Design a protein with these regions (language model features):
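Short, hydrophobic-biased segments on the C-terminal half of alpha helices
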Residues: 44-45
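N-terminal helix-turn-helix DNA-binding core of bacterial DNA-binding proteins
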Residues: 3-35
Length: 91
């Protein structure tokens, strides 16, 4: 199923925290994306129902295999877009 741009942002951040720290927490995501805790919690419920993350209410947010694959793709896509924009500016 296709993720909304908003859920993609959440998943990409979770993936970045995951590769850095090994986990993410709702507070981390809230600060990083500058969104309220209830908004993050709502998004986490959605991502969990779509089988991208494992989520314990007061615990850490983990990634499923599907979440890791998608997160990796989103980060890579972002890098490609950034390089493309740099190329456009150079011309």
């Amino acid at each position: 199923s296709m993720l909304s741009p908003s859920l993609e942002d959440y998943l990409e951040e979770i993936y970045r925290f995951h590769t850095g720290l090994g986990f993410a927490r709702v507070t981390d995501i809230s600060h990083k994306l500058n969104v309220s805790m209830p908004s993050v919690t709502k998004a986490m419920r959605k991502l969990r129902s779509l089988d991208y993350i494992t989520y314990q209410r007061y615990g850490h947010i983990g990634l499923t295999d599907k979440g890791i694959e998608t997160g990796k793709f989103l980060v890579r896509r972002n890098h490609i877009l950034q390089e493309f924009l740099v190329m456009l500016r150079a011309n």
